[in-house]
Design a protein with these regions (language model features):
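Histidine- and aromatic-rich ligand-binding microenvironments
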Residues: 16-25, 173-183
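Short alpha-helical
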Residues: 22, 59, 63, 74, ...
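Conserved NAD(P)+-binding/catalytic subdomain of aldehyde/semialdehyde dehydrogenases
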Residues: 123, 174-223
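Small-residue (primarily alanine) positions within well-ordered alpha-helices
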Residues: 31-34, 144, 163, 217
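Hydrophobic packing residues within well-ordered alpha-helices of enzyme cores
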Residues: 90, 163-166, 193, 213
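Active-site-adjacent beta-strand anchor residues
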Residues: 17, 127, 152-156, 183, ...
Length: 223
């Protein structure tokens, strides 16, 4: 079990079943199977889904801030500001994704056309930090979802409840269940996650953990 404690009081506020190798593999396989259909959705559809997620954050700031403060210990005002500020970043991604991934010609001749086009990576791991989970996580999973990827989201064990809340809001907003999956646990869960045949890994955390991730995924030339 993963025990979540309030760092200000030491009180236990939740006990959660941790993922294991079997459940991580199952979540990966489900994400892999679901991702092509998500990528096939027209971009405006995915934009609408993430816009609903932004609206859900905006309408639930107080409750979400209370959860964030209870498990990280940051002042409630800072938690509110983080959630409110993250909606501005989401707006940026909503407004800029279409132009960023648009196919563009770089050379055209009588018998040749060269162009740059973009495709989703596929299934990506998002290993996030505890101190600003809405900023740090959202900087990865929002553009990843907008561009047609499936996300296996491993929040810090010190911000797990917030990670679960993010997952619930995304699913209620229209992100399919297996396109965004939350993994529960500490460093061992992250280590097991990156052993899966994922297509990319995005990490924010300590230098030592970053080195371990690089040693695991570097030979596979992951993004």
């Amino acid at each position: 079990m993963l025990i979540i404690r309030n760092p200000a009081t030491g009180a236990t506020i939740a006990e959660l079943q941790q993922d294991d190798a079997q459940s991580i593999s199952a979540k990966y396989l489900a994400a892999r199977a679901a991702q092509p259909a998500w990528a096939a959705q027209p971009l405006p559809n995915r934009i609408d889904v993430l816009r609903r997620f932004r609206d859900a954050l905006t309408s639930d700031v107080e409750r979400l801030a209370a959860v964030l403060t209870s498990e990280t210990g940051k002042p409630i005002r800072q938690s509110r500001n983080e959630i409110k500020g993250s909606t501005g970043r989401i707006d940026f991604f909503l407004e800029s994704t279409e132009g960023a991934i648009a196919t563009r010609a770089v050379h055209t001749a009588a018998n040749m056309r060269e162009q740059i086009s973009h495709e989703p990576l596929g299934v990506v791991a998002n290993i996030s930090a505890w101190n600003y989970p809405y900023f740090v996580g959202g900087n990865v999973f929002v553009p990843a979802l907008l561009t047609g990827n499936a996300v296996l989201y491993k929040p810090s064990e010190f911000a797990t409840l917030t990670g679960i809340e993010i997952g619930k809001l995304l699913h209620r907003s229209g992100v399919p269940q297996h396109i965004f999956a939350v993994l529960v646990g500490g460093g061992a869960i992250g280590s097991e996650l990156i052993k899966q045949p994922i297509d990319g890994v995005f990490f924010t955390g300590s230098y030592a953990t970053g080195q371990r991730i690089a040693r695991e995924v570097g030979p596979r030339m992951l993004k």
